[in-house]
Structures are given as structure tokens and as C-alpha cells.
Amino acid sequence: MVQVNFQVLAELDAAGRAALLRRSETDLSMFLEKVGPILEAVRTEGDAALVRFGRELDRAEGLTREGLKVTEAEFDEAFGLVEPEIVAAIRFAIGNIRTFHEEQAPEPMWLKELRPGAFAGDRFTPIRSVALYVPRGKGSFPSVTMMTSVPAVVAKVPQIAIFTPPAPDGRVDAATLVAARLAGVETVYKVGGAQAVAAAAYGTETVTPALKIVGPGSPWVVAAKRLLAGVIDPGLPAGPSESIILADETVHGGLAALDLLIEAEHGPDSSAWLVTHSRQVAEEALAALPGHWSAMTPQRVDFSQAVLCGRAGGIVLTGSAEESHAFVNDYAPEHLQILSEKPFEHLGRITEAAEVLMGPHTPITIANFCLGPNAVLPTSRGARTWGPLSVHDFLRRSSVGYVTAPAYPELAEVAKRLAEYEGFSSHANAVGPMRDAYLKR
């Protein structure tokens, strides 16, 4: 019989509470050891290593050196392989995602006159090249393609390339190609796993190297990003899926259970908790889960049961709404859904969550696919300092300053005084009489 993990927070000591905060993702130490040789092989062997690892690790026997990059014909064929209603859904989602990220995009530059004649501001320019990682291990993810591609295109990154694992026949998921083209990305490589991160970092005969890589992935991908952080910007920490459903007494526990399964079904390495101070809601959720499982595919049932019956998922019963809020902030979840008739009353208490979805009509599903905000989010408590993937992740920010001749003397005098105090003679000379002599010429 299935035994869902049920924890009463008041009954746990400090160690027990700390254990609830741990994610289910595997210890990376084992992967760090195994990934090292893969990265070195790609660096030294290039395309040959990509094909070899594609065949060995992704079982893509049909992969060839000539076929590492998706062709125009493959893009065109993809539209014939995906049902029209799915293509329409992808178009709809991309429209919302683009609108959101266009609103998010900053002006190219702003300047403010801080003192008469002294101006300073910020200037934003796109990163020269980025790699977008789209996983495939437990399913097809055109949604990840949309969420990574659209902000990069809105940011006007000149060189954008998608990396995604090939199927056994050496082909790429058709819906991923449809999403890529509709989003505005034309370069897709049939490379996944640690070897994709290495190819993006070092480049090969076929792959053009990038300055940054973004997108969620397996522990192999996470380990590779960590090892290559000095070569390529690894972006925000995006590992296995995680969520908290925060429910109060104003909703039915069956609804909370329905939404609890959204992230739990991603895979056995996901983390998913229902947090509530209402015992009735908790008991209703427990009672509803078997019925919800009966409406899922066997594989997704297995995944979600592994999560909810393991150490990284289940139900947490707290003593009060305030205690629930504190638990959420300690956990710093990737996804937070607030199930309440008055969700905004809870929102003010939440400080550490990458995504906050409010009310019974805003399930994680809608946000994952088509609401508009980005669904590539920091995991493993990354929400304590990181936010969702955004246009800003694809932009460089440079500060800009301009001082006019009338404003110069006042600023120079202050700067000279501070430079002399800190012992920097050249700093002081650059704003002293020596400069004045040159400026008078």
C-alpha cells in the first residue's frame, strides 16, 4: 500500500526540520567524477566525441558527424509531424511569453543628471552568444525551448543555439524544432548531457562556442556546468523540479492534491510538498490522491509516488499560517502556488520563492506553459538570491558616466581628496594640476 510522507512540523526537532529542506537530487560528487573525462574528450576530440557519447549515453545509434546540426529540411519536416492544434498552442504560448519579456526588457540606456553637468546611468547590450539547453530524458519539452528562446530573441542576442539530446534514430523532437523556429531560433544541435555543455564551452568543428548556457538539466548537465564555470557562464542553478503548494482552510484538499502532483510527476528526483495549517485540508488531500493517480499514466504515477512517498515530498502540517509562511521562506521553492480565497494576504509574508502563483485559477501548469512569465527557475534554494530566467540574463549592463567642464572642478576636488587619503598618487594626479595643465591647452 502506498504510504504518503506526512509530517507534523511541531513534532520535528531541528534536524528533522532541516531534512525537509533537502532536495531529492543526487549528490553531485559521483557525477563530477564521471563528467570530467567527457568534458576533456569533447575539448580534445570535438565532433568525434559528440557522436560517440551520443551513441553510448543517449543510445542515438543514428547520430552522425554530418548530422549533428539540424538542417532546414528537418525544421520544415517537423511542422508536418506535429499536430496543428499543438502548433497553434505553441504559437499562443510564445505570444504571451514574448509580450511578457518585451515588457520586461529595459531601455537600451538611461542617464540621470546627478549634479548639474554630471551624468551617470546604465547601458544594456546583448551578450554576443548563448547556448540554450533543452532536456529530453523523461519527455519532450517544447515549453523549455519557448522559455529559453524567447527572452534571448527579445534581448537581440546575435548568436543563439539550442542543444538537445537526439533520439535513437539521431533526430530531434519535432515539437522542439517547431517551438525553436516560431520563437526565432534557427540553430539547433543534436547534443545533450555533459557533452552539450562541453561543446557549448569549447566549441567543435560543427559547434560554435558560446559565452553562456542556460536551461534545466540532469545531474550530468548540472555537474558539467559546475566544472566549466570558469570557461562558460553556467547561468542560474536549474536542476530537478520542485514545488510547494501552500493551502489554507478556504480551499478543498482535493484541489491541493491535484496541484501537488504537477511537479511531482516530472521524475523521481523532483521535490513536491503540500504545506497547510489545516488538518482537514491535509486529510482531504490524502484521501484524494488515489483518485488522482487513477487518471495518470503509469509512468507518471510511479514518478509522483516515488516523490510523495520519499524523503523529498509529501504533506507538511504546520501549526499556523505564520508557521507555513516561515517554512516556505526557509525552503525557497522553485514554484510556489498559494491556494486560498485570499491569496494576496499570504503574498506579503512570502519573501523567498522563485515563482508565486496565486489563487485556485492559477495552477503551475498554466505558468509552466503559457501564462507569460519565465518557467526556467532556480532550484535547490537558489531562490534565496536568484530569480527566474529573464531578458536581463541575456544582456550585459555597463555603467555610463559623462562629466561636463563646468561640473568637473567640484567632482575632481572630492575625488583628489579621497585618492590622497587612500594613498593613490596617480589617481590624485589625474584630477589635480597636471590634468588642469592639459585641459587648458
UniProtKB/Swiss-Prot annotation:
Catalytic residues identified in the record: 334-335
One CC-aspect GO term: cytosol
Disulphides: none
Broad EC category: oxidoreductase
Binding site for Zn(2+): 266, 427
EC number of this enzyme: 1.1.-.-
Keyword annotations of the record: Metal-binding, Oxidoreductase, Zinc
Cofactor comment: Binds 1 zinc ion per subunit.
Family: Belongs to the histidinol dehydrogenase family.
Protein name, UniProt field: Histidinol dehydrogenase homolog
